[in-house]
Amino acid sequence: MRASNEFCGTQLIEALNEDIERELRIADEHIARALSAHSLRKDAAQRHSSSCAAAAMRHATALAAEVLHLGGVPAPCIPRDMPCSRDRLARGSDLFRRYRQRLKMANDLGLLRLEDVLREIIQELRVCSRTRSGMFRLIRIN
């Protein structure tokens, strides 16, 4: 049984490292978007993109702390070859799905601290998700 838990722990660390890379990529995209904003609502777009970039960096940092706590080594850099989705809603849905999977894995392994971190990230993602029209939208995670 212990070997199975170690295998699951290794899988979880690998999955969390993938999530760290995704969060860093998202932060990078938001920073680029903030720097290239040229619309009439430039200030609002820059504030929103900066806020989302900061949230993604907080998520990556929290996940890196959990990877260290689990005995792993956090992902070191942003993967430049990672495909980037133009559809923010689809990307947001994918993030929620991935974090729900991590939450289940953490629950199965009895990792309460990681569960708390993931719940906090999911809650923050709910607030930061936006539709194409620019209105805030809550995405259900049931």
Question: What kind of feature is each model-predicted range?
Answer:
Residues M1-N142:
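Iron-associated oxidoreductase/ferritin-like identity signal
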